Amino acid sequence: MVDRLVNSEANTRRIASVENCFGSSGVPLAMQGRVLVGEGVLTKMCRKRPKSRQFFLFNDILVYGNIVIGKKKYNKQHIMPLEEVSLESIADNQTYRNGWYIRTTTKSFVVFAATSTEKQEWMAHINKCVEDLLRKSGKKPVENHAAVWVPDTDASVCMHCKKTQFTFIQRRHHCRNCGAVVCAGCSAKKFLLPQQSTKALRVCDACYERLKHVPSSLGSGEDSAAATGAASGNKLNTTAGDSSNDEDSDEETASPGGESHDEPRFYGDNSVLSAVEDSSTITSPSSATTGSLEAPQVTPSVQSSPAAVATTGSHC
């Protein structure tokens, strides 16, 4: 079990190495009781394109970041509390494979592993950590999660009005409630979604109409959050652009398919698939083995969890 690694020198050394790789762009990760369970590279579907991201699984959080030049440093660190994490496997098809959803209340997206074995390892270890954490804390699993954004490339026209053609002038926008790609005219309103932000967020007209009629007496879940938003006063969208402020910027280059990557390495629990020996030290970001990552593609749909691969929230 990973518990026996809590006070081990190997665990302390691994966490210190992760902190060093993020440098000043990250926050301190070492804390009492925290164990680094595993690490490796996954392909994450961002808003515009799939990109390689370095993931670190701890016994209480999931951390990931951008891989910087040379694969020796990482930046744009993101931390997801495991008690909020829920996974859902995505069936393989002719276009993409080895993928699954990672969902939380504030952010949801899809990742792809290089092989089916790596997918099984990642999902098994994450689920095990979530189960252990919830059991120890006595908390119940989170039921409501942020929607997965439909990728920009999957919508050439507005998914709401079916008329507006997206161009350099007619920009794409994402509904923060359902994840659909919509035009400015079909997403001119904002609504407070408390689980995602303390500020009102852009939503499509369909979601706005539904959310504003949610009774304020509801006690929990998504409808409760919507009721809170309705009671707090929502407004027209006064911003000119889609202020998602994510890291999926045009100047950031996509990682080419088939790029070499670090094989995932897991520590301390040999009962979960092919975990490595406790004595293993953290993998050097520069060491790698070859694995083919296929670019994912999906059919967009407007629903609470669109069958699409992208990102939600303010970051990618």
From Swiss-Prot:
Q: Which GO terms describe its biological process?
A: endocytosis; endosome organization; endosome to lysosome transport
**Coiled-coil region(s) at which residues?**
none
* Zinc finger (FYVE-type) residue numbers: 152-212
Give any extra note attached to this record: The name 'rush hour' derives from the overexpression phenotype which displays a disruption to endosomal trafficking and cargo progression.
GO molecular function annotation? phosphatidylinositol binding; zinc ion binding
* Residues reported to bind Zn(2+) 2: 175, 178, 204, 207
| Amino-acid positions noted as binding Zn(2+) 1 in the UniProt annotation, renumbered to this chain | 158, 161, 183, 186
Q: Where is the composition biased (Low complexity)?
A: 279-292
Composition skew (Acidic residues), residue ranges? 244-253
Q: Name one GO cellular component term.
A: late endosome
Q: What is seen without this gene?
A: No visible phenotype. No effect on the subcellular localization or expression of Rab7, Rab11 and Avl.
Complexes and interactors: Interacts with Gdi (Rab GDP dissociation inhibitor).
Q: Where is this region: Disordered?
A: 215-316
Q: What is known of its domains?
A: The FYVE-type zinc finger domain is necessary and sufficient for endosome targeting and localization to the plasma membrane.
Q: In which tissues is it expressed?
A: In ovaries, expressed both in the germ line cells and in the overlying somatic follicular epithelium.
Q: Where is composition skewed (Polar residues) in this entry?
A: 298-316
The role this protein plays is: Functions in the regulation of endosome morphology and late endosome formation. Has a role in controlling trafficking from early to late endosomes and from late endosomes to lysosomes. Important for localization of Gdi to the endosomal membranes. May function in controlling the activity of multiple regulators in the endocytic pathway, perhaps by positively controlling those involved in the early steps of endocytosis such as Rab5 and hrs, and negative regulating those involved in the late stages of endocytosis like car and VhaSFD.
What protein name is recorded for this chain? Pleckstrin homology domain-containing family F member 1 homolog
Tell me what organism the protein belongs to: Drosophila melanogaster (Fruit fly)
Q: Where is the PH domain?
A: 35-131
